[in-house]
């Protein structure tokens, strides 16, 4: 059977469910896919289809994630749900699923729990921009005042982690009762079941509150250099994949990282042996540069729109250290450890100055499997920005993965 063509009729948004274990994330994901299928947008998935998440490998780390897709009237969504807590942590740090927004699931019967807070903190640190709350298990709360208290507590918790707690929409409901109703009648329409209506309401809220993200083509141009060669009589060509934005022949760009930043002009663009006038995000392209010698440019530098990115040596990051079973280290390490930081296309040696645990306590020793904050100083400046992902490597193998939380220097 021929594959269906993916048609881009609606804007695409990446979303995920986050929250404490057993508060109903996977049940909600199943209820959403079935409710949207009932409205005519996609194919419903049952709980078991989502819960048996396939393993994915991202930067050498195995993560169980389930991706489902569905459509609302306004958008096409790709939705990620991770079964295990450790998978969430790894997923968010490695960016296996970069979320444009998240649905935070909180049980109305229990209120915010430790992992609720951990996921909110993580969402903040890895740059999930917007959150909508689903207050689940409403059917288990007899007292309306109790539900209001839980709602206040959720808003307060969000405020503590610098999300706009007062503005964030909170939709109460019961994922389980909605899912049961949808399983009995997969073609249910709005107005037939109050619990299913709450799922429709949740998705209308997500449509309205989570903005359509700026796509990579609209951002300032950036391409990490993968290879460099010279063409006699024409000059130097840098090849790589355009990470974001677009570039045209004749435009001025900067070469950033590893050495002094230099400015040059794009004199030609080539892809698959054909010349282009313009290259956009996602293209694998050769960029011909005016007045640049082959020795002036190397793998690990980036070509970028002037002023859009600067080289740095010091940053803080949120990092997950692989366990022995995941192919990571067998032994702990200490402050002063000097691994390689693999950023975009190159390894740069860096020294880990300090560590802090997740609850912000200073610590001296880091064990495989830990999640920590660290401050790093690289021996060479490279183009770094907040929210950028990297791998930590030692002797060619990945021992950790991280995301830049802040630039220090």
UniProtKB/Swiss-Prot annotation:
Q: Which UniProt keywords apply?
A: Chloroplast, Elongation factor, GTP-binding, Hydrolase, Magnesium, Metal-binding, Nucleotide-binding, Plastid, Protein biosynthesis
Q: List the disulfide bonds.
A: none
Residues engaged in binding Mg(2+): 26
Using the UniProt annotation, give all residue ranges assigned to the region (G2). 60-64
Q: Recorded E.C. number(s)?
A: 3.6.5.3
Give binding positions for GTP: 19-26, 81-85, 136-139
Q: Where is this region: G5?
A: 174-176
Please state the protein's primary subcellular location: plastid
Class of the enzyme per the UniProt entry, highest EC level: hydrolase
- Quick one: where's region G4? 136-139
Looking up SUPFAM superfamilies in the UniProt record yields:
EF-Tu/eEF-1alpha/eIF2-gamma C-terminal domain (SSF50465), P-loop containing nucleoside triphosphate hydrolases (SSF52540), Translation proteins (SSF50447)
Gene Ontology annotations for the cellular component aspect, listed alphabetically: chloroplast; mitochondrion
Q: State any GO BP term from the record.
A: mitochondrial translational elongation
Ranges for the region named G3 are 81-84
User: Which Pfam families does the annotation name?
Assistant: GTP_EFTU, GTP_EFTU_D2, GTP_EFTU_D3
According to UniProt, the reaction catalysed is:
GTP + H2O = GDP + phosphate + H(+)
Tagged with keyword Magnesium: yes
Subcellular location(s) of the protein = Plastid, Chloroplast
Q: Which HAMAP family match?
A: EF_Tu_B (MF_00118_B)
Family of this protein: Belongs to the TRAFAC class translation factor GTPase superfamily. Classic translation factor GTPase family. EF-Tu/EF-1A subfamily.
Please describe what this protein does: GTP hydrolase that promotes the GTP-dependent binding of aminoacyl-tRNA to the A-site of ribosomes during protein biosynthesis.
Its name, as the record gives it, is Elongation factor Tu, chloroplastic
> What organism is recorded for this protein?
Pleurastrum terricola (Filamentous green alga)
Q: Which gene encodes it?
A: tufA
């Amino acid at each position: 059977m021929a594959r269906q063509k993916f048609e881009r009729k609606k804007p695409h948004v990446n979303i995920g469910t986050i929250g404490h274990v057993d508060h109903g994330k996977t049940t909600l994901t199943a209820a959403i896919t079935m409710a949207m299928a009932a409205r005519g947008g996609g194919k419903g998935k049952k709980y078991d289809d989502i819960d048996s998440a396939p393993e994915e490998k991202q930067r050498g780390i195995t993560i169980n994630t389930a991706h489902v897709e569905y459509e609302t009237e306004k958008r096409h969504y790709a939705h990620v749900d991770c079964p295990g807590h450790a998978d969430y942590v790894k997923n968010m740090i490695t960016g296996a699923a970069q979320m444009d927004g998240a649905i935070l699931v909180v049980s109305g019967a229990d209120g915010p729990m430790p992992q609720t807070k951990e996921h909110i903190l993580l969402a903040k640190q890895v740059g999930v921009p917007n959150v909508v709350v689903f207050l689940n298990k409403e059917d288990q709360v007899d007292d309306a005042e109790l539900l209001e208290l839980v709602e206040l507590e959720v808003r307060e918790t969000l405020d503590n982690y610098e999300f706009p707690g007062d503005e964030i929409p909170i939709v109460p409901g019961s994922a389980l009762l909605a899912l049961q109703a949808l399983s009995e009648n997969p073609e249910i329409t709005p107005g037939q079941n109050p619990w299913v209506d709450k799922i429709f309401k949740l998705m209308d809220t997500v449509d309205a509150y989570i903005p359509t993200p700026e796509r990579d083509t609209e951002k300032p141009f950036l391409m990490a250099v993968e290879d460099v060669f010279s063409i006699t009589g024409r000059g130097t060509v840098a090849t790589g994949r355009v990470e974001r934005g677009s570039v045209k022949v004749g435009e001025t760009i900067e070469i950033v990282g590893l050495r002094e930043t230099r400015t040059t002009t794009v004199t030609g663009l080539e892809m698959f042996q054909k010349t282009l006038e313009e290259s956009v995000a996602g293209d694998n392209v050769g960029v011909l540069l005016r007045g640049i010698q082959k020795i002036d440019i190397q793998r690990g530098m980036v070509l970028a729109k002037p002023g859009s990115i600067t080289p740095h040596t010091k940053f803080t990051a949120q990092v997950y250290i692989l366990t022995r079973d995941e192919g990571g280290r067998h032994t702990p390490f200490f402050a002063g450890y000097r691994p390689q930081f693999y950023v975009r296309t190159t390894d740069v040696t860096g020294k880990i100055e300090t560590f802090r645990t997740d609850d912000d306590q200073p610590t001296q020793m880091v064990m495989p499997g830990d999640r920590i904050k660290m401050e790093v100083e690289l021996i060479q400046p490279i183009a770094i920005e907040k929210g950028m992902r990297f791998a930590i490597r030692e002797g060619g193998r990945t021992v950790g993965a991280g995301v830049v939380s802040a630039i220090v220097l």
